[in-house]
Protein backbone atom coordinates (compact mmCIF):
# COMPACT_ATOMS: atom_id res chain seq x y z
CA UNK A 1 0.00 0.00 0.00
CA UNK A 2 2.87 2.27 0.84
CA UNK A 3 4.52 1.42 -2.43
CA UNK A 4 1.46 2.39 -4.46
CA UNK A 5 1.17 5.67 -2.59
CA UNK A 6 4.84 6.39 -3.20
CA UNK A 7 4.44 5.59 -6.86
CA UNK A 8 1.46 7.88 -7.18
CA UNK A 9 3.36 10.67 -5.46
CA UNK A 10 6.27 10.45 -7.88
CA UNK A 11 4.02 10.30 -10.94
CA UNK A 12 2.14 13.42 -9.88
CA UNK A 13 5.41 15.25 -9.29
CA UNK A 14 6.65 14.55 -12.86
CA UNK A 15 4.03 15.97 -15.23
CA UNK A 16 6.39 15.72 -18.24
CA UNK A 17 6.30 11.90 -18.11
CA UNK A 18 3.28 9.86 -19.12
CA UNK A 19 1.47 7.98 -16.38
CA UNK A 20 1.89 4.58 -18.04
CA UNK A 21 5.62 4.79 -18.67
CA UNK A 22 6.33 6.33 -15.22
CA UNK A 23 4.37 3.76 -13.24
CA UNK A 24 5.97 0.87 -15.12
CA UNK A 25 9.50 2.15 -14.52
CA UNK A 26 8.97 2.93 -10.83
CA UNK A 27 7.30 -0.41 -10.12
CA UNK A 28 10.20 -2.23 -11.72
CA UNK A 29 12.72 -0.27 -9.63
CA UNK A 30 10.87 -0.52 -6.30
CA UNK A 31 9.78 -4.12 -6.95
CA UNK A 32 6.28 -3.57 -5.67
CA UNK A 33 4.09 -6.65 -5.72
CA UNK A 34 1.54 -6.53 -8.51
CA UNK A 35 -1.07 -8.85 -9.85
CA UNK A 36 0.47 -11.01 -12.57
CA UNK A 37 -1.40 -11.31 -15.80
CA UNK A 38 -0.80 -12.86 -19.19
CA UNK A 39 2.39 -11.56 -20.89
CA UNK A 40 1.71 -8.76 -23.38
CA UNK A 41 1.97 -9.52 -27.06
CA UNK A 42 4.94 -8.32 -29.14
CA UNK A 43 2.82 -5.72 -30.94
CA UNK A 44 1.50 -4.24 -27.71
CA UNK A 45 5.04 -4.07 -26.24
CA UNK A 46 6.02 -1.47 -28.88
CA UNK A 47 5.28 2.05 -27.70
CA UNK A 48 3.54 4.54 -30.04
CA UNK A 49 6.72 6.62 -30.08
CA UNK A 50 8.79 3.64 -31.27
CA UNK A 51 6.22 2.87 -33.95
CA UNK A 52 6.28 6.48 -35.08
CA UNK A 53 10.08 6.43 -35.31
CA UNK A 54 10.01 3.22 -37.35
CA UNK A 55 7.43 4.70 -39.73
CA UNK A 56 9.52 7.84 -40.18
CA UNK A 57 12.64 5.77 -40.84
CA UNK A 58 10.80 3.69 -43.45
CA UNK A 59 9.47 6.81 -45.11
CA UNK A 60 12.93 8.38 -45.23
CA UNK A 61 14.28 5.23 -46.89
CA UNK A 62 11.43 5.34 -49.41
CA UNK A 63 12.18 8.97 -50.26
CA UNK A 64 15.87 8.13 -50.69
CA UNK A 65 15.04 5.33 -53.13
CA UNK A 66 12.68 7.60 -55.07
CA UNK A 67 15.39 10.26 -55.28
CA UNK A 68 17.83 7.74 -56.74
CA UNK A 69 15.29 6.81 -59.44
CA UNK A 70 14.52 10.41 -60.37
CA UNK A 71 18.23 11.28 -60.50
CA UNK A 72 18.87 8.34 -62.83
CA UNK A 73 15.93 9.31 -65.08
CA UNK A 74 17.21 12.89 -65.16
CA UNK A 75 20.66 11.80 -66.36
CA UNK A 76 19.20 9.43 -68.97
CA UNK A 77 16.91 12.17 -70.32
CA UNK A 78 19.84 14.61 -70.40
CA UNK A 79 21.89 12.22 -72.53
CA UNK A 80 18.97 11.48 -74.87
CA UNK A 81 17.97 15.12 -75.39
CA UNK A 82 21.48 15.91 -76.58
CA UNK A 83 21.27 13.13 -79.18
CA UNK A 84 17.82 14.30 -80.26
CA UNK A 85 19.05 17.86 -80.77
CA UNK A 86 22.07 16.59 -82.70
CA UNK A 87 19.72 14.67 -84.99
CA UNK A 88 17.84 17.90 -85.74
CA UNK A 89 21.04 19.80 -86.48
CA UNK A 90 22.64 17.01 -88.51
CA UNK A 91 19.61 16.80 -90.78
CA UNK A 92 19.63 20.53 -91.37
CA UNK A 93 22.13 20.70 -94.32
CA UNK A 94 20.08 18.28 -96.42
CA UNK A 95 16.83 20.08 -95.64
CA UNK A 96 18.26 23.53 -96.37
CA UNK A 97 19.91 22.43 -99.63
CA UNK A 98 16.64 20.87 -100.72
CA UNK A 99 14.84 24.13 -99.94
CA UNK A 100 17.28 26.11 -102.08
CA UNK A 101 16.83 23.75 -105.04
CA UNK A 102 13.04 23.88 -104.76
CA UNK A 103 13.06 27.66 -104.50
CA UNK A 104 15.22 28.04 -107.63
CA UNK A 105 13.04 25.65 -109.61
CA UNK A 106 9.91 27.44 -108.49
CA UNK A 107 11.39 30.80 -109.52
CA UNK A 108 12.05 29.49 -113.03
CA UNK A 109 8.50 28.19 -113.33
CA UNK A 110 6.83 31.43 -112.27
CA UNK A 111 6.37 32.52 -115.89
CA UNK A 112 4.91 29.16 -116.91
CA UNK A 113 1.38 28.05 -116.26
CA UNK A 114 2.32 25.02 -114.17
CA UNK A 115 -0.03 23.21 -111.82
CA UNK A 116 1.87 21.91 -108.77
CA UNK A 117 -0.64 20.07 -106.52
CA UNK A 118 1.26 20.37 -103.23
CA UNK A 119 1.60 24.16 -103.51
CA UNK A 120 -1.89 24.81 -104.84
CA UNK A 121 -4.04 26.93 -102.55
CA UNK A 122 -7.78 26.27 -102.73
CA UNK A 123 -10.80 27.34 -100.64
CA UNK A 124 -10.71 25.60 -97.28
CA UNK A 125 -13.69 23.42 -96.41
CA UNK A 126 -12.01 20.67 -94.38
CA UNK A 127 -8.77 20.70 -92.37
CA UNK A 128 -6.58 17.79 -91.28
CA UNK A 129 -4.79 18.23 -87.95
CA UNK A 130 -1.60 16.21 -87.40
CA UNK A 131 -1.18 16.14 -83.60
CA UNK A 132 2.25 14.99 -82.38
CA UNK A 133 2.46 13.86 -78.74
CA UNK A 134 4.86 11.73 -76.72
CA UNK A 135 4.87 8.01 -76.05
CA UNK A 136 5.61 8.19 -72.32
CA UNK A 137 4.70 10.18 -69.24
CA UNK A 138 6.74 11.65 -66.38
CA UNK A 139 7.48 14.72 -68.48
CA UNK A 140 5.50 17.42 -66.69
CA UNK A 141 2.77 19.06 -68.75
CA UNK A 142 4.35 18.28 -72.13
CA UNK A 143 1.51 16.11 -73.47
CA UNK A 144 -1.24 18.16 -71.82
CA UNK A 145 -0.06 21.38 -73.45
CA UNK A 146 -0.13 20.05 -77.01
CA UNK A 147 -3.50 18.34 -76.45
CA UNK A 148 -4.96 21.59 -75.10
CA UNK A 149 -3.58 23.34 -78.18
CA UNK A 150 -5.34 20.80 -80.38
CA UNK A 151 -8.61 21.20 -78.47
CA UNK A 152 -8.44 24.97 -78.85
CA UNK A 153 -7.82 24.65 -82.60
CA UNK A 154 -10.70 22.18 -82.99
CA UNK A 155 -13.00 24.60 -81.16
CA UNK A 156 -11.82 27.41 -83.44
CA UNK A 157 -12.49 25.36 -86.58
CA UNK A 158 -15.98 24.51 -85.32
CA UNK A 159 -16.63 28.19 -84.76
CA UNK A 160 -15.62 28.90 -88.36
CA UNK A 161 -17.99 26.21 -89.61
CA UNK A 162 -15.18 24.06 -91.06
CA UNK A 163 -14.95 20.29 -90.99
CA UNK A 164 -11.87 18.62 -89.55
CA UNK A 165 -10.16 15.29 -89.01
CA UNK A 166 -7.26 14.31 -86.78
CA UNK A 167 -4.12 12.29 -87.48
CA UNK A 168 -2.73 11.30 -84.09
CA UNK A 169 1.00 10.60 -83.76
CA UNK A 170 2.19 9.30 -80.39
CA UNK A 171 0.82 6.87 -77.79
CA UNK A 172 -0.40 9.54 -75.39
CA UNK A 173 -2.39 11.28 -78.09
CA UNK A 174 -3.72 7.96 -79.36
CA UNK A 175 -5.07 6.98 -75.94
CA UNK A 176 -6.58 10.46 -75.51
CA UNK A 177 -8.49 10.44 -78.81
CA UNK A 178 -9.54 6.79 -78.43
CA UNK A 179 -11.41 7.78 -75.27
CA UNK A 180 -13.23 10.53 -77.20
CA UNK A 181 -15.10 8.92 -80.09
CA UNK A 182 -16.86 12.18 -80.94
CA UNK A 183 -13.55 13.51 -82.39
CA UNK A 184 -13.08 12.17 -85.95
CA UNK A 185 -9.65 10.53 -86.29
CA UNK A 186 -8.32 9.43 -89.67
CA UNK A 187 -5.36 7.38 -88.42
CA UNK A 188 -3.41 6.48 -85.28
CA UNK A 189 0.38 6.40 -85.67
CA UNK A 190 3.40 6.00 -83.39
CA UNK A 191 6.45 8.24 -83.53
CA UNK A 192 8.92 5.75 -82.04
CA UNK A 193 11.71 6.26 -79.53
CA UNK A 194 13.98 7.77 -82.19
CA UNK A 195 12.10 9.22 -85.20
CA UNK A 196 13.49 8.29 -88.60
CA UNK A 197 12.48 8.92 -92.19
CA UNK A 198 10.38 5.74 -92.04
CA UNK A 199 8.07 7.10 -89.33
CA UNK A 200 7.92 10.47 -91.08
CA UNK A 201 7.04 8.78 -94.37
CA UNK A 202 4.06 7.04 -92.76
CA UNK A 203 2.66 10.44 -91.78
CA UNK A 204 3.60 12.02 -95.11
CA UNK A 205 1.86 9.29 -97.12
CA UNK A 206 -1.37 9.76 -95.21
CA UNK A 207 -1.50 13.57 -95.46
CA UNK A 208 -0.33 13.42 -99.09
CA UNK A 209 -3.20 11.13 -100.10
CA UNK A 210 -5.75 13.22 -98.19
CA UNK A 211 -4.58 16.46 -99.81
CA UNK A 212 -4.13 15.16 -103.37
CA UNK A 213 -7.53 13.45 -103.36
CA UNK A 214 -9.01 16.75 -102.11
CA UNK A 215 -10.56 15.08 -99.07
CA UNK A 216 -8.98 17.93 -97.12
CA UNK A 217 -8.01 21.36 -98.38
CA UNK A 218 -5.42 22.16 -95.73
CA UNK A 219 -3.11 20.17 -93.43
CA UNK A 220 -1.90 21.68 -90.15
CA UNK A 221 0.90 20.26 -88.03
CA UNK A 222 0.63 20.59 -84.23
CA UNK A 223 3.82 19.78 -82.36
CA UNK A 224 6.03 21.10 -79.56
CA UNK A 225 8.81 23.31 -80.86
CA UNK A 226 12.13 22.84 -79.10
CA UNK A 227 13.47 26.24 -78.06
CA UNK A 228 15.91 25.35 -75.28
CA UNK A 229 16.34 22.90 -72.44
CA UNK A 230 14.08 24.96 -70.21
CA UNK A 231 11.64 26.24 -72.81
CA UNK A 232 9.44 24.62 -75.43
CA UNK A 233 6.15 25.75 -76.88
CA UNK A 234 3.32 24.02 -78.77
CA UNK A 235 2.93 25.50 -82.24
CA UNK A 236 0.68 25.06 -85.29
CA UNK A 237 2.25 25.17 -88.74
CA UNK A 238 0.65 24.87 -92.14
CA UNK A 239 2.00 21.66 -93.66
CA UNK A 240 0.00 21.65 -96.89
CA UNK A 241 -0.13 23.53 -99.17
CA UNK A 242 3.65 23.88 -99.06
CA UNK A 243 5.30 27.28 -99.06
CA UNK A 244 7.17 27.74 -102.35
CA UNK A 245 10.04 29.47 -100.52
CA UNK A 246 10.60 26.59 -98.13
CA UNK A 247 9.55 28.57 -95.08
CA UNK A 248 7.58 27.33 -92.12
CA UNK A 249 4.27 29.21 -91.95
CA UNK A 250 1.75 29.34 -89.17
CA UNK A 251 -2.02 29.18 -89.59
CA UNK A 252 -2.20 32.93 -90.16
CA UNK A 253 0.21 32.78 -93.08
CA UNK A 254 3.14 34.31 -91.19
CA UNK A 255 6.33 32.56 -92.31
CA UNK A 256 9.55 32.35 -90.32
CA UNK A 257 13.06 31.19 -91.10
CA UNK A 258 13.77 27.98 -89.22
CA UNK A 259 17.46 27.64 -90.08
CA UNK A 260 18.71 28.73 -86.65
CA UNK A 261 19.05 26.44 -83.65
CA UNK A 262 20.24 26.73 -80.09
CA UNK A 263 23.05 24.22 -79.78
CA UNK A 264 24.04 23.20 -76.26
CA UNK A 265 26.58 21.05 -74.47
CA UNK A 266 25.93 19.28 -71.16
CA UNK A 267 28.77 19.75 -68.68
CA UNK A 268 29.33 19.50 -64.94
CA UNK A 269 30.22 22.44 -62.74
CA UNK A 270 30.87 22.05 -59.03
CA UNK A 271 29.39 18.57 -59.14
CA UNK A 272 26.13 19.68 -60.78
CA UNK A 273 24.77 19.28 -64.30
CA UNK A 274 24.93 22.55 -66.26
CA UNK A 275 24.32 23.62 -69.84
CA UNK A 276 26.51 25.67 -72.15
CA UNK A 277 24.50 27.27 -74.96
CA UNK A 278 25.44 28.76 -78.29
CA UNK A 279 23.47 29.81 -81.36
CA UNK A 280 24.06 27.49 -84.30
CA UNK A 281 23.14 28.19 -87.89
CA UNK A 282 23.79 25.73 -90.67
CA UNK A 283 25.52 27.34 -93.67
CA UNK A 284 23.55 26.89 -96.88
CA UNK A 285 24.99 26.46 -100.33
CA UNK A 286 24.89 29.32 -102.81
CA UNK A 287 23.23 28.44 -106.10
CA UNK A 288 23.60 30.18 -109.37
CA UNK A 289 20.46 32.08 -110.40
CA UNK A 290 20.65 30.25 -113.72
CA UNK A 291 20.39 26.49 -113.31
CA UNK A 292 20.22 23.99 -116.14
CA UNK A 293 18.29 20.77 -115.62
CA UNK A 294 18.50 17.69 -117.79
CA UNK A 295 14.93 16.66 -116.91
CA UNK A 296 11.83 18.76 -117.10
CA UNK A 297 11.75 21.09 -114.04
CA UNK A 298 8.14 20.10 -113.42
CA UNK A 299 9.15 16.45 -113.10
CA UNK A 300 11.94 17.38 -110.71
CA UNK A 301 9.55 19.50 -108.66
CA UNK A 302 7.00 16.68 -108.45
CA UNK A 303 9.74 14.33 -107.23
CA UNK A 304 11.29 16.70 -104.70
CA UNK A 305 8.15 18.10 -103.07
CA UNK A 306 7.18 14.79 -101.39
CA UNK A 307 10.78 14.50 -100.18
CA UNK A 308 10.58 18.01 -98.77
CA UNK A 309 7.27 17.16 -97.09
CA UNK A 310 8.94 14.15 -95.46
CA UNK A 311 11.83 16.30 -94.20
CA UNK A 312 9.45 18.81 -92.61
CA UNK A 313 7.53 16.08 -90.80
CA UNK A 314 10.75 14.40 -89.67
CA UNK A 315 12.00 17.68 -88.26
CA UNK A 316 8.74 18.18 -86.34
CA UNK A 317 8.98 14.65 -84.89
CA UNK A 318 12.59 15.21 -83.85
CA UNK A 319 11.83 18.57 -82.24
CA UNK A 320 8.87 17.07 -80.41
CA UNK A 321 11.06 14.27 -79.06
CA UNK A 322 13.73 16.75 -77.96
CA UNK A 323 11.05 18.83 -76.21
CA UNK A 324 9.66 15.74 -74.47
CA UNK A 325 13.08 14.67 -73.21
CA UNK A 326 13.89 18.21 -72.05
CA UNK A 327 10.55 18.35 -70.20
CA UNK A 328 11.27 14.96 -68.60
CA UNK A 329 14.73 16.10 -67.54
CA UNK A 330 13.26 19.25 -65.99
CA UNK A 331 10.47 17.30 -64.26
CA UNK A 332 12.89 14.73 -62.84
CA UNK A 333 15.20 17.51 -61.68
CA UNK A 334 12.32 19.15 -59.81
CA UNK A 335 11.29 15.77 -58.38
CA UNK A 336 14.85 15.15 -57.16
CA UNK A 337 14.99 18.58 -55.50
CA UNK A 338 11.60 18.01 -53.85
CA UNK A 339 12.73 14.57 -52.63
CA UNK A 340 15.87 16.12 -51.15
CA UNK A 341 13.82 18.77 -49.32
CA UNK A 342 11.35 16.17 -48.06
CA UNK A 343 14.19 13.94 -46.87
CA UNK A 344 15.71 16.82 -44.91
CA UNK A 345 12.40 17.73 -43.25
CA UNK A 346 11.64 14.09 -42.37
CA UNK A 347 15.15 13.59 -40.98
CA UNK A 348 14.70 16.68 -38.81
CA UNK A 349 11.39 15.38 -37.43
CA UNK A 350 12.93 11.93 -36.88
CA UNK A 351 15.92 13.35 -34.99
CA UNK A 352 13.67 15.51 -32.80
CA UNK A 353 11.44 12.57 -31.85
CA UNK A 354 14.44 10.34 -31.25
CA UNK A 355 16.02 12.99 -29.04
CA UNK A 356 12.76 13.36 -27.12
CA UNK A 357 12.60 9.59 -26.64
CA UNK A 358 16.17 9.43 -25.33
CA UNK A 359 15.56 12.38 -23.01
CA UNK A 360 12.44 10.71 -21.64
CA UNK A 361 14.31 7.48 -20.96
CA UNK A 362 17.07 9.37 -19.14
CA UNK A 363 14.50 11.18 -16.99
CA UNK A 364 12.86 7.86 -16.13
CA UNK A 365 16.20 6.39 -15.04
CA UNK A 366 17.05 9.43 -12.94
CA UNK A 367 13.60 9.43 -11.36
CA UNK A 368 13.85 5.74 -10.55
CA UNK A 369 17.29 6.18 -9.00
CA UNK A 370 16.03 9.05 -6.87
CA UNK A 371 13.09 6.92 -5.74
CA UNK A 372 15.44 4.29 -4.30
CA UNK A 373 17.21 6.86 -2.12
Curated annotation (Swiss-Prot):
<keyword id="KW-0375">Hydrogen ion transport</keyword>
<dbReference type="GO" id="GO:0015986">
    <property type="term" value="P:proton motive force-driven ATP synthesis"/>
</dbReference>
<keyword id="KW-0150">Chloroplast</keyword>
<dbReference type="GO" id="GO:0006754">
    <property type="term" value="P:ATP biosynthetic process"/>
</dbReference>
<feature type="active site">
    <location>
        <position position="139"/>
    </location>
</feature>
<comment type="subunit">
    <text>F-type ATPases have 2 components, CF(1) - the catalytic core - and CF(0) - the membrane proton channel. CF(1) has five subunits: alpha(3), beta(3), gamma(1), delta(1), epsilon(1). CF(0) has four main subunits: a, b, b' and c. Interacts with PAB.</text>
</comment>
<dbReference type="GO" id="GO:0009534">
    <property type="term" value="C:chloroplast thylakoid"/>
</dbReference>
<dbReference type="InterPro" id="IPR035968">
    <property type="entry name" value="ATP_synth_F1_ATPase_gsu"/>
</dbReference>
<comment type="function">
    <text>Produces ATP from ADP in the presence of a proton gradient across the membrane. The gamma chain is believed to be important in regulating ATPase activity and the flow of protons through the CF(0) complex.</text>
</comment>
<feature type="modified residue" description="Phosphoserine">
    <location>
        <position position="347"/>
    </location>
</feature>
<dbReference type="GO" id="GO:0009507">
    <property type="term" value="C:chloroplast"/>
</dbReference>
<keyword id="KW-0793">Thylakoid</keyword>
<keyword id="KW-0809">Transit peptide</keyword>
<dbReference type="GO" id="GO:0045259">
    <property type="term" value="C:proton-transporting ATP synthase complex"/>
</dbReference>
<keyword id="KW-0472">Membrane</keyword>
<comment type="similarity">
    <text>Belongs to the ATPase gamma chain family.</text>
</comment>
<keyword id="KW-0597">Phosphoprotein</keyword>
<dbReference type="Pfam" id="PF00231">
    <property type="entry name" value="ATP-synt"/>
</dbReference>
<keyword id="KW-0406">Ion transport</keyword>
<dbReference type="GO" id="GO:0009579">
    <property type="term" value="C:thylakoid"/>
</dbReference>
<feature type="transit peptide" description="Chloroplast">
    <location>
        <begin position="1"/>
        <end position="50"/>
    </location>
</feature>
<keyword id="KW-1015">Disulfide bond</keyword>
<dbReference type="GO" id="GO:0046933">
    <property type="term" value="F:proton-transporting ATP synthase activity, rotational mechanism"/>
</dbReference>
<dbReference type="GO" id="GO:0009535">
    <property type="term" value="C:chloroplast thylakoid membrane"/>
</dbReference>
<keyword id="KW-0813">Transport</keyword>
<dbReference type="GO" id="GO:0030234">
    <property type="term" value="F:enzyme regulator activity"/>
</dbReference>
<keyword id="KW-0066">ATP synthesis</keyword>
<dbReference type="GO" id="GO:0005829">
    <property type="term" value="C:cytosol"/>
</dbReference>
<keyword id="KW-0139">CF(1)</keyword>
<keyword id="KW-0934">Plastid</keyword>
<protein>
    <recommendedName>
        <fullName>ATP synthase gamma chain 1, chloroplastic</fullName>
    </recommendedName>
</protein>
<dbReference type="InterPro" id="IPR023632">
    <property type="entry name" value="ATP_synth_F1_gsu_CS"/>
</dbReference>
<feature type="disulfide bond">
    <location>
        <begin position="249"/>
        <end position="255"/>
    </location>
</feature>
<dbReference type="GO" id="GO:0009941">
    <property type="term" value="C:chloroplast envelope"/>
</dbReference>
<dbReference type="InterPro" id="IPR000131">
    <property type="entry name" value="ATP_synth_F1_gsu"/>
</dbReference>
<dbReference type="GO" id="GO:0009772">
    <property type="term" value="P:photosynthetic electron transport in photosystem II"/>
</dbReference>
Amino acid sequence: MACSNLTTMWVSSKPSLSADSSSLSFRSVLKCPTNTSSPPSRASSVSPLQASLRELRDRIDSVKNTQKITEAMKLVAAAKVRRAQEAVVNGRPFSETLVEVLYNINEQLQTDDVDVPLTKVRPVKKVALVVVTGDRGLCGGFNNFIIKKAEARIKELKGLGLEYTVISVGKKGNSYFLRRPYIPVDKYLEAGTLPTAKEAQAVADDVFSLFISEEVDKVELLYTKFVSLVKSEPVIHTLLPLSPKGEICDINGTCVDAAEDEFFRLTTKEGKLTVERETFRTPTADFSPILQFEQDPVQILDALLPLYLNSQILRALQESLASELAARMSAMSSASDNASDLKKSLSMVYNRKRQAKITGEILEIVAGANAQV
